[in-house]
């Protein structure tokens, strides 16, 4: 029978529930269990696809085209699985589904209520995740903090699941904070006690408490928490700030967290073999070289907006025993006069995805600098579109060349709306989303990176390269090295007379893994290291 683990949070948000859940998933997978994982977000948006990155961080896209929470990126990178649309559920999705059923008459004229209709829909999403993946264990993270009014239906639903399928099949893990008060020189357990008290008042008794802390938690403090929270002392797990996220699974294993889980859920699996993971963490902690990459974006104040890009750069660096330092460059501040000052000390330049016109001209200036000064360059999504526009303007001499998204009246729409998007009015969930094939041309940097004729990558875009400009740009050394299999859509571009200048319409960062870097990032970082060594 499938087992269910629920991870909740208390005291404050951003405690690392997602990392805790992902780390536990890694440990259970390494015990030979088939693990899947999902995130429940209490906000009323149907998905984060139309939310500002300042509100939510990056939007993580799954193979099947779901626009999801950035925690799913952590889940995929840690557990090394590909998740799907069932892996992220919001209050908006739940209510939308229930209201559609009500309109279809599925409730037979009854009064639709939070209990049982909303809670039953939530429970169905939990069970469906297990059915669709045939998982041994389903880990569900509940977003937000215990005590939030938005979370109440989710907490009631997961309380009911224990009654539905039995205590041996359900486990509750609660993540809290033990703050350190400098003035008093003390760590305080009272916020955790109150958080657990609140959770218990809702009918949920946590089986494990994971406490975030800056300093070590004494045995006396663990005993005190265990007494007041009614759990075993060994089930108080310390989660101190780590030097690398990838060390967290090892810390949890050292405290036998995965064994406690298996004992409670009656799972008789051998101990997790973390030899390979330990080697990875040791490598990360002992990188001997450095390279600096300029990330030129418009959301650089909130680095979570580009979290998968940064992780993909780091993964690539691990392959070369190199610590990749990211220099955050606000695209709105970049001009032709100061670009040398802002990016001249870096070994490579990356322009990530985005929407809208803010910061576009600064990104184009940075791309021109990379092209003219032979600096390794990687463009992603909008970065690929702007690389095409920069080339059209400054090599072909097409003054005013632009994207019809940014300037609908441009005389040269190098980037234009996909034909199937012409009549689309809704913004949410209507882009070209998910995994699509890309055919590569031989003897190109893209082909050399993948070493395969056809690759599959995840997309999230509405605009595409305008094919009427392909012949003129090819004549000037602009290479279309990757296209859709029918040749209609441009997927990857690069430059002939440049050491390494590649840009992709898709989002390669979404499939990178710490022990298996994404090929374009791998070769981009290698080119950046070579550039540094040649200076």
UniProtKB/Swiss-Prot annotation:
Function comment: Catalyzes the ATP-dependent amination of UTP to CTP with either L-glutamine or ammonia as the source of nitrogen. Regulates intracellular CTP levels through interactions with the four ribonucleotide triphosphates.
Q: According to the UniProt entry, how is activity regulated?
A: Allosterically activated by GTP, when glutamine is the substrate; GTP has no effect on the reaction when ammonia is the substrate. The allosteric effector GTP functions by stabilizing the protein conformation that binds the tetrahedral intermediate(s) formed during glutamine hydrolysis. Inhibited by the product CTP, via allosteric rather than competitive inhibition.
- The name of this protein is CTP synthase
Identify the stretch(es) annotated as Amidoligase domain: 1-267
**Complex and partners:** Homotetramer.
Query: Pathway listed for it?
Result: Pyrimidine metabolism; CTP biosynthesis via de novo pathway; CTP from UDP: step 2/2
- Write down the superkingdom of origin: Bacteria
Q: Where does the chain bind CTP?
A: 13, 148-150, 188-193, 224
**Other notes:** CTPSs have evolved a hybrid strategy for distinguishing between UTP and CTP. The overlapping regions of the product feedback inhibitory and substrate sites recognize a common feature in both compounds, the triphosphate moiety. To differentiate isosteric substrate and product pyrimidine rings, an additional pocket far from the expected kinase/ligase catalytic site, specifically recognizes the cytosine and ribose portions of the product inhibitor.
Q: Provide the Glutamine amidotransferase type-1 domain boundaries.
A: 292-534
Q: Where does L-glutamine bind?
A: 54, 354, 382-385, 405, 462
- Catalyzed reactions: UTP + L-glutamine + ATP + H2O = CTP + L-glutamate + ADP + phosphate + 2 H(+); L-glutamine + H2O = L-glutamate + NH4(+); UTP + NH4(+) + ATP = CTP + ADP + phosphate + 2 H(+)
Which residues does the record give as Mg(2+) binding sites?
Answer: 71, 141
Q: Which GO terms describe its biological process?
A: 'de novo' CTP biosynthetic process; pyrimidine nucleobase biosynthetic process
Q: Which residues bind UTP?
A: 13, 188-193, 224
Q: Can you name the source organism?
A: Bacillus cereus (strain G9842)
